[in-house]
Amino acid sequence: MARPDDPFESQDDVSDKSEDDELDEQDAVSLLTSDHAEVKQMFEEYRQLVQNDADDDRRGELAGRICSALTVHAEIEEDIFYPALRERLDDDLALDQAEVEHAIARDLIEQIVAMEPDDALFDARVLVLAEYVEHHVQEEESEIFPQAEKSGIDLDELGAALAERRHELRAELEAD
């Protein structure tokens, strides 16, 4: 059963198929774009919590969910999506830049995870991460995804591989 604060489980089990199952059937670009939208929504919620001076527990819980979602997303891109594209694309610069951006985001995530929500600069770090990720997403969706769609790669097969690995990583995080 999903915990109410679990960002990876659907709370709406009204059909035989869960939301996760439906997302798992997406092609690679659609799956990654859905992840982007999910994280964007969480960042918007975080901004609202900061603006409304929400308590530390609520901000800390949401920041943890954001960091977990970004960690899983970056790993599936780096382990599966980017290598598959490298085999098909002539120009690796956009992928190289995306991986560097992931490394910088990972550093910020590590700083956030090591902090408490009432620490100085906690909110600032989460909000800078939001801005950074929004920039990365914009580049990825406007440059890398169109290249992927034109590359001839089987995006459905790649989407299935991404979904499977994402499910494994989420299960590992939940077990910790």
What are the functions of these language-model segments?
Residues 1-176:
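Small-residue-biased structural context
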